[in-house]
């Protein structure tokens, strides 16, 4: 009973925080890759995640995960090969969780966190933008990662490997 009373009276408990699930019907993450002969995108609309808000409604923390197999590049052969290359059976998810989020008055966010992919945790930082839309909040942004940072051997086509750089764009609603 004393412990419960101490928890209830602690300053951290008094700070109101709200946790919201991301809107799985609207949220997407898209990767873009390039090869000497062509470029393509793959999109996942199968995201799980949560956003923790501070008392003032600003974002305090975020965590998002997607199955690697959920990304669709509109080419089943390319998607199947990508699943082999990234060892999706061994590492089925790609995820991000924030370690710090700093909000500016103009709606932009400086986000730092950890991208988990292919069994590797990599610190990353990017800018994002928030927009309030009739009771829903949209967060958009982009960042770049390198395949070699996640110990992924670059696939080749016609003896030429794909570019090392992967561009990621996200559009998350909550």
List each model region and its residues:
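Low-complexity, acidic/polar, glycine-enriched regions of mature
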Residues: 17-174
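Bacterial Sec-dependent N-terminal signal peptides
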Residues: 1-19
């Amino acid at each position: 009973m004393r412990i419960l009373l101490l928890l209830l009276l602690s300053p951290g408990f008094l700070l109101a925080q709200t946790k919201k699930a991301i809107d799985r019907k609207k949220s997407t993450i898209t990767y873009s890759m390039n090869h000497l002969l062509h470029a393509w995108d793959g999109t996942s609309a199968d995201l799980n995640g949560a956003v923790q808000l501070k008392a003032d409604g600003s974002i305090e923390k975020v965590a998002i995960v997607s199955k690697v197999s959920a990304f669709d590049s509109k080419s089943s052969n390319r998607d199947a090969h990508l699943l082999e290359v990234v060892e999706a059976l061994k590492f089925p998810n790609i995820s991000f969780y924030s370690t710090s989020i700093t909000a500016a008055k103009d709606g932009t966010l400086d986000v730092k966190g950890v991208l988990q992919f292919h069994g590797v945790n990599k610190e990353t930082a990017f800018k994002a933008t928030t927009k309030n839309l009739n009771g829903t909040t949209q967060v958009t942004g982009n960042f770049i990662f390198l395949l070699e940072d996640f110990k992924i051997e670059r696939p080749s086509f016609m003896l030429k490997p794909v570019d090392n750089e992967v561009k990621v764009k996200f559009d998350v609603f909550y």
